[in-house]
A protein has these predicted regions:
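N-terminal pre-domains immediately preceding structured catalytic cores
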Residues: 2-621
Length: 621
């Protein structure tokens, strides 16, 4: 971001506001007797500490322990407490990013540009959200801006490309002032380049979980019209929800019934996460358990509205969540929850079109991933039904080095999830176009290898979590595990998920992939295999220069025992072409498309060829 340095300096000073009314901490009722254990946990009801409980006794008393600490990570990113396995490679980075501590140099160039990682599966720590809630200077700045020109727009203009009209100019001027309030732009009386306004708008959208091409669409205009304290409160509820999901071992979010609930009468996610998939609600679908549990936790802590939440942080003094675990009463978990659950997965490919993109028809039924659990009564419950992706036409280098289009298919049939890889690395196949492996430094204007794409990290082509699709075949010497390169994995290419296309893999929103992995490790027997320390270097040539992409390790592996059964259904093949096209075809002439303009200014997403695994790259060294 152009104002990244100023932004980080401003944020670093905000937690001091938490000390404003620290003297009121004595008003919190204290129990007469502390339980006999070394680390008793505070029990909260209706915003008041009503007692303390030993962690071991909490389940007996119907209480759930929720870790609100600033060094929290999801279950999938934790390692066993032993001296055998190396630490998870991405854990410390995750904690720093959640606290908006962005690395210096090239390592931090991507997160500094993204500014807010809420949209990409790394929810801010409570310290960060509390500082936002208590930032009265920012709230007052927003309230003083007349944003009526934004709300009266008849179109959804994009700052970097929009045709200049009086209405658009007035709207962009108001937007500029609001983004200065957000400290995403420096205050300036000079005329600002429109690409800077574009970058700042995209960062604002990421902050509020808005999936957009960086345009002033209706959803963004609604957010800009909202009170900033309300938006910060929704961010607080999203962070709390992640902690509740982890603490209670939940995943059931209502998607199997096509109904996501609200929390304190609020829809706290962007519209894209409530979009329909064209499928009917499932009779065997689990109800939304996540939203009621999150609301129960919020009410227990007294976080019922922005003012009440702000008062909580003021009352508890500076850095209240540096180390904080609380005990609250949540709705009971379903009876089918267990340490080892009988689970299976079904991936419905939905409507499949093999025609070239320009000739493809409408996708009415989008691909979905459904996780089932078998109950003690031998019935099945659909826990979630999430949007995912299947194959499509993607760019690839042909045999003579020319760029063309090839259809990347998603395998159909029964597979197994055995290997669950956290913070995975992506190994570029030989046919990956070089342009997909570089990005341009905005400051220096030079091309450098895109190490973020390889991982580990939220911007990896595989996201934060990957599950390998294996086909097990029994041979004379035991089981042979065939890997055709298909994975279920996280991604920050959210537009591809909404448009249902990938390079053959089944993509999930980054935060959903983390939830899935954490649920599997919580409710499925597994072995911790640990760090996959197999270094690799990918060499390629870009514009006459030889470049190297080092891959120091390939992720942190867990082995599910037994593996989870996965069935990929064929879906419904539409159009005249009924079989998978095998040949590579010439690139069609470029056509104007809304996403083309956005791609010029949006942060780089996992590029073309990100899942091609037809031939493993040659090892170096």
């Amino acid at each position: 971001m152009p104002a990244a340095a100023d932004t980080q300096a401003d944020r670093a000073s905000r937690p001091a506001a938490l000390a404003a009314d620290a003297g009121e901490a004595s008003a919190v009722p204290q129990p007469a007797e502390a339980p006999e254990c070394s680390s008793p946990v505070a029990v909260f009801e209706a915003g008041v500490e009503v007692g303390r409980v030993c962690p071991a006794d909490a389940p007996r008393d119907g209480l759930t322990l929720i870790d609100l600490s600033d060094d929290w990570v999801p279950g999938a990113l934790r390692e066993p407490d032993d001296a055998v396995h190396l630490p998870q490679p991405y854990r410390s980075a995750y904690v720093k990013l959640a606290n908006e501590e962005f690395p210096a140099g090239l390592e931090g160039e991507r997160p500094r540009r993204d500014a807010f990682l809420d949209l990409y599966g790394i929810f801010p720590s409570l310290q960060v959200v509390a500082a936002r809630l208590l930032d009265e200077e920012r709230h007052a700045c927003h309230a003083a801006v007349d944003a009526s020109a934004i709300q009266t727009l008849a179109t959804s203009p994009q700052p970097s490309t929009a045709q200049v009209t009086p209405a658009v100019t007035a709207a962009f001027a108001a937007l500029d002032r609001l983004l200065v309030c957000e400290r995403l732009l420096p205050a300036s009386t000079r005329r600002r380049p429109r690409w800077r306004l574009q970058e700042a708008l995209e960062a604002y959208q990421r902050k509020h979980m808005i999936v957009s091409y960086g345009v002033l669409d209706r959803e963004t205009r609604r957010a800009l019209e909202q009170d900033t304290r309300e938006l910060d409160f929704r961010a607080l509820l999203r962070t709390l929800r992640a902690r509740v999901i982890d603490a209670a071992g939940l995943i059931e979010d209502g998607t199997a019934r096509a109904v996501r609930g609200t929390i304190l009468s609020r829809q706290i996610d962007g519209d894209a996460f409530h979009a329909g998939d064209g499928h009917e609600p499932m009779e065997e679908g689990a109800p939304d358990l996540v939203s009621p549990a999150t609301e129960a936790a919020a009410r227990a802590l007294g976080w019922t509205d922005p003012a009440a939440a702000a008062e909580f942080f003021l009352r508890h003094g500076p850095a209240p969540t540096r180390r904080l675990t609380v005990a609250v009463r949540l709705p009971p978990a379903p009876a089918y929850h267990d340490e080892h659950m009988d689970l299976r997965v079904e991936i419905d490919r939905g409507d499949v079109w093999y025609e070239l993109p320009a000739r493809r028809g409408r996708v009415a039924h989008h691909p979905t991933l459904t996780l089932y659990a078998r109950t003690s009564g031998d019935e099945e419950v659909a826990l979630v039904r999430w949007p995912t992706t299947i194959g499509g036409w993607k760019k690839e280098l042909g045999p003579k080095g020319k760029l063309g289009l090839r259809y990347k298919n998603s395998d159909v049939g029964k597979r197994l999830w055995r290997d669950l890889i956290v913070s995975p690395a992506w190994l570029p196949p030989l046919e990956t176009p070089p342009r997909a492996l570089v990005h341009r430094l905005s400051a220096a204007g030079k091309w450098i290898p895109d190490t973020d794409l390889l991982g580990p990290g939220y911007a990896s082509a595989y996201g934060l979590v990957m599950l390998v699709h294996h086909r097990a075949v029994e041979g004379a010497d035991g089981t042979v595990w065939y890997d055709n390169g298909i994975r279920t994995h996280g991604s920050l290419s959210y537009h591809s998920i909404l448009e249902s296309e990938s390079h053959g893999c089944h993509r999930l929103f980054n935060h959903a992939a983390v939830q899935l992995a954490s649920f599997l490790l919580r409710h499925r027997n597994h072995l911790t295999r640990g760090l996959m320390a197999r270094p690799f270097v990918h060499e390629f040539t870009w514009r006459g220069t030889k470049l190297k992409l080092p891959i120091p390790q390939r992720g942190y592996r867990f082995e599910l025992t037994p593996p989870v059964e996965v069935e990929v259904l064929p879906g419904t093949v539409r159009g005249k072409i009924q079989r998978v096209p095998l040949r590579i075809v010439k690139l069609p002439r470029p056509q104007a498309h809304a996403s083309d303009a956005a791609a010029k200014v949006a942060p780089p997403l996992p590029p073309e060829g990100s899942e091609v695994q037809a031939a493993p790259p040659k090892q170096s060294g």
